């Protein structure tokens, strides 16, 4: 019995996370089966691409009449569609079991999204372990993401966001692994493959590419400065290994951009050609030339934060739909629950930011806060520009690429608050902030940011506090499910 107890103490967090992920995956799948298609934004238009691939066994042109939307005059075949490629095996499996109608194939594509969401939760846990989080913080980081209403909603229907979240987490895991292994060739290949996957996910995730480049060169610069490297070795580290990363990423995503460039006269992104196609085939009011964007009306971009447009105040709608707005942006969870969610997350996030700044107060460590900040902020900047210059879309899903990082920081913040409670109590409790340094590291070398951890002796009061935090978040999600999701968004697939 004592052996089992000790084993549970050592691996209790892993078991808890496994149970949590399985539970959330089952919930995502159940919702995917029962979410009406009218409540799944853009799903019908986005499904045209995987349905075309399934039917014809080849990739579509973006301007193929079979997939051009009759209202918008364009298709998702111009932009990256990694999520469609991931859905195809699930659609084949559905056909294998005798379900090849449109409804069954759509559900199969939705299930592929549920799988992506569950794998992403696993990666968030892996990242927390790479960062040497406590068991409580590791479990909480997965819980915060998996039970965020908007994340659950995005897992329940076919979209590009879940692959965006997953690929961003893959980049983080690969970069941390590369740092730990001094950017071995295998690590560089892993970073390249993850960046290639990210490039096929969604344009709003591309901030992670810039963040990964910054992380690589900052770590390499510090490592090379601390060590005794020859000129040739420095060239290998700073030039040849980035080439390995680039080639590896192109092996995954290069075909798409080369194909686009060939098909659309050098337009490897596909956006300009998509706009030209929309100008030609869209209904009159939806043609790009007839859209009154804020930019075309002469407004500066910051006007989004000063006044509402079209009855929508951009910051408010982004904030609410970041937490949870379902259907066609018309099913809200209620002001009380927005208040509870936002304040709960804000307390943990602010505490986590303060804790990270305190831990990384040396200049060398502070520099490593830049890449995660870029991952969080660049999607926000892209969303602001898109709403200002192209299409006024105040949607939280466009800025969620970095929420995995925010969930980790928030979990770290709550962990720090619990540690602070122990310091204040001063009863049979101690806090030890310990820097785990690589063996034989001299004082001139950088202290690894991914090897900082807070170790403390637990007591009953702190365990109770941690339990209350977890129970509060689970209860809040349960209330949203019973009062909003089940009555409004669980009406059976149509």
Question: Each predicted region: which residue ranges?
Answer:
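Perimembrane helix-loop-helix junctions
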Residues: 3, 177-179, 208-247
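Transmembrane signal-anchor helices characteristic of membrane glycosylation enzymes that use polyprenol
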Residues: 12-44, 51-62, 71, 244-262, ...
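Transmembrane-helix signature of polytopic, membrane-embedded enzymes
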Residues: 99-103, 124-147, 166
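Short acidic/glycine- and proline-prone juxtamembrane loop motifs at membrane-interface regions
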Residues: 150-163
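Membrane-lumen/periplasm interface segments of specific transmembrane helices
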Residues: 218-221, 240-349, 483-484
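Transmembrane helical bundles and short interhelical boundary loops of multi-pass, membrane-embedded
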Residues: 256-257, 336-339, 418-494
């Amino acid at each position: 019995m004592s052996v089992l107890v000790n084993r549970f103490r050592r691996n209790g967090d892993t078991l808890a996370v496994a149970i949590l992920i399985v539970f959330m995956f089952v919930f995502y799948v159940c919702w995917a089966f029962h979410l009406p298609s009218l409540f799944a934004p853009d799903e019908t238009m986005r499904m045209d691409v995987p349905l075309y691939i399934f039917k014809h066994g080849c990739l579509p042109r973006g301007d193929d009449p079979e997939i051009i939307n009759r209202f918008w005059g364009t298709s998702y075949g111009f932009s990256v569609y990694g999520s469609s490629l991931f859905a195809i095996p699930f659609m084949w499996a559905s056909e294998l079991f005798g379900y090849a109608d449109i409804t069954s194939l759509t559900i199969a594509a939705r299930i592929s999204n549920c799988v992506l969401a569950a794998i992403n939760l696993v990666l968030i846990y892996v990242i927390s372990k790479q960062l040497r989080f406590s068991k409580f913080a590791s479990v909480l980081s997965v819980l915060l993401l998996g039970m965020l209403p908007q994340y659950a909603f995005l897992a329940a229907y076919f979209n590009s966001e879940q692959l965006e979240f997953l690929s961003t987490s893959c980049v983080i895991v690969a970069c941390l692994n590369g740092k730990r292994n001094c950017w071995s060739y295998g690590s560089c290949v892993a970073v390249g493959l993850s960046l290639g996957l990210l490039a096929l996910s969604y344009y709003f995730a591309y901030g992670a590419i810039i963040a990964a480049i910054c992380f690589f060169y900052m770590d390499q610069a510090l490592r090379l400065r601390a060590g005794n490297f020859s000129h040739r070795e420095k060239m290998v580290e700073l030039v040849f290994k980035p080439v390995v990363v680039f080639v590896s990423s192109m092996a995954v995503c290069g075909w798409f951009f080369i194909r686009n460039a060939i098909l659309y006269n050098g337009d490897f992104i596909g956006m300009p050609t998509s706009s030209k196609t929309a100008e030609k085939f869209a209904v009159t009011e939806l043609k790009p030339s007839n859209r009154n964007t804020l930019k075309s009306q002469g407004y500066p971009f910051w006007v989004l934060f000063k006044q509402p447009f079209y009855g929508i105040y951009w910051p408010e709608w982004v904030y609410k739909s970041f937490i949870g707005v379902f259907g066609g942006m018309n099913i809200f969870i209620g002001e009380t629950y927005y208040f509870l969610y936002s304040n709960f997350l804000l307390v943990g996030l602010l505490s986590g930011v303060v804790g990270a700044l305190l831990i990384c107060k040396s200049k060398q460590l502070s520099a490593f806060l830049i890449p995660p900040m870029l991952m969080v902020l660049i999607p926000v900047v892209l969303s602001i520009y898109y709403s200002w210059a192209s299409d006024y879309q105040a949607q939280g899903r466009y800025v969620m690429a970095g929420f995995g990082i925010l969930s980790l920081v928030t979990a770290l913040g709550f962990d720090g608050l619990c540690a602070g409670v122990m310091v204040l109590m001063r009863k049979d409790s101690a806090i030890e902030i310990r820097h785990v340094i690589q063996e034989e590291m001299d004082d001139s070398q950088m202290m690894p940011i991914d090897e900082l951890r807070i170790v403390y002796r637990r007591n009953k009061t702190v365990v109770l506090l941690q339990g209350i935090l977890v129970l509060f978040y689970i209860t809040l999600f349960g209330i949203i499910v019973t009062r909003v999701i089940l009555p409004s968004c669980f009406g059976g697939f149509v």
